Amino acid sequence: MKTFVPKNNEQNWVVVDAAGVPLGRLATLVASRIRGKHRPDFTPNIIQGDFVVVVNAEKVVLTGNKLDGKVYTRYTGYQGGLKTETARQALAKHPERVIEHAVFGMLPKGRQGRALHSRLKVYAGTTHPHAAQKPQQLEVRTALEVK
């Protein structure tokens, strides 16, 4: 008996509108699509997920007290260089990074996970430069209800 190895010859592009969607629900859906877990022939060691374009990143919703309670921390590399900012400040400055941070935290941390990072495209507004790829619109609410 031979081992079945699925082919990865289709490059699907999906557009997700983040307006009014909670950050965690959006991130789980996007990470699952990028990884390819929605496919019936999912294989963990093969990159076969979709390219996901997220628009309206500035309109994503954080529930509860997370706008002021959630803190993003980074280290510059210098002494005393620990920089922190709240989710409210991060959404005001660069809303794309908030979604990227949430999605990348749900992807594998090794070589394959770093290769999956290029499959996520996040834009603050409604326009994106990927119209040539003919992306399909994906409704977050209906996609979450199917599971």
Swiss-Prot record:
User: Protein name, please?
Assistant: Large ribosomal subunit protein uL13
Q: Which GO terms describe its molecular function?
A: mRNA binding; structural constituent of ribosome
Gene3D superfamilies in the record, alphabetically? Ribosomal protein L13
What Gene Ontology terms describe where this protein resides (cellular component)? cytosolic large ribosomal subunit
Domain of life where this protein originates: Bacteria
Q: What Pfam families is this protein classified in?
A: Ribosomal_L13
Q: What's the stated role of this polypeptide?
A: This protein is one of the early assembly proteins of the 50S ribosomal subunit, although it is not seen to bind rRNA by itself. It is important during the early stages of 50S assembly.
- Give the quaternary structure: Part of the 50S ribosomal subunit.
**Homology family:** Belongs to the universal ribosomal protein uL13 family.
Q: Give the record's GO biological process terms.
A: negative regulation of translation; translation
Give the keywords, sorted.
Ribonucleoprotein, Ribosomal protein
